[in-house]
Regions:
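A polyanion-binding, active-site-adjacent surface
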Residues: 2-164, 170-184, 211-212, 216-231
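A hydrophobic alpha-helix/topogenic segment detector
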Residues: 183-262
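Intrinsic low-complexity, intrinsically disordered segments enriched in polar/basic residues
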Residues: 1-3, 167, 236, 262
Length: 262
């Protein structure tokens, strides 16, 4: 099978699993469902950056609910891509109503030399959890979700064979490490972990190729607020949830390891 054939087989397998996954696994709090709008890509986020020959894989935790008000414009554009009405999907990255995560990712990837307003052949975006909440965008995260989707993430990583995997947030990093190694790694004190510079692991994919796995803070409002906790601006004031200077320093350390656009 070609790489693309393996990829589309993976999408079909994940969909089939979610459609028949016992309700008991997702009872209590938000339930995870498959999104039928994932027709061309494995994840809604993947419509943004989706090179199967990517050098860098960006991994988030989970999308949230695609049916909520905040997702309407995004879902409309993705459906246009699926129907052939437009060729490519990009989120709104300028002007009003820019999603904080998307806007901050644009700035953070600029540290590595990438422009997220274009399709970058080095990049592939996905969430680790491939299902979608039936309501809400956060809270109620369950380790069962990680155990269920870990085999699919491993298959995805082994199709793409990235050199670098950047994980947004503690749960994502722990999930990726479990998915790729089968071992559980628990991070205590996530900010200290990032500050230490020891937030990099090297794993071997089934082909024998190594991949560097980096933990970074999620760059949404809450993740940025948590990363800035206890940090001060140059004038001594507290950093707000809109300031990503600390996260830029984290990404500069990734760049210092040679991870950047060539």
């Amino acid at each position: 099978m070609t790489k693309r054939e393996k990829y589309h087989q993976l999408i079909a397998d994940v969909r089939e699993d979610y459609l028949h996954r016992p309700v008991a696994q997702t009872s209590g709090g938000p339930k995870l469902l498959w999104c039928e709008d994932c027709k061309q890509e494995i994840n809604l986020w993947t419509y943004w950056q989706n090179s199967l020959d990517a050098k860098i894989m960006l991994v988030g935790q989970d999308w949230g609910c695609p049916c909520d008000e905040a997702s309407k414009t995004t879902m409309h554009r993705i459906r246009q891509v699926n129907d052939g009405g437009i060729e490519q999907f990009f989120p709104n990255l300028s002007g009003k109503n820019v999603n904080p995560t998307d806007g901050n990712l644009k700035e953070l990837f600029r540290v590595l030399g990438y422009d997220l307003k274009t399709k970058e052949p080095d990049l592939f975006f996905t969430n680790f959890i491939l299902g979608y909440r039936d309501h809400g965008t956060s809270g109620g995260f369950r380790q069962q979700w990680v155990r269920d989707d870990a085999p699919y993430f491993k298959r995805l990583a082994e199709i793409i064979e990235p050199e670098t995997i950047i994980c947004l947030g503690k749960n994502t990093f722990e999930g990726v490490m479990f998915g790729l190694t089968g071992k559980t790694e628990r991070v205590r004190g996530f900010n200290r972990f990032l500050d230490s510079g020891e937030n990099r692991r090297t794993v071997s994919l089934s082909s024998g190729k190594p991949a560097s796995v980096y933990a970074v803070a999620h760059c949404g409002t809450i993740g940025t607020m948590n990363r800035n906790r206890g940090k001060k601006a140059e004038d001594g004031s507290n950093l707000s949830s809109k300031e990503i200077a600390v996260q830029k320093q984290d990404w500069e350390r990734i760049k210092a390891n040679g991870i950047q656009k060539k």
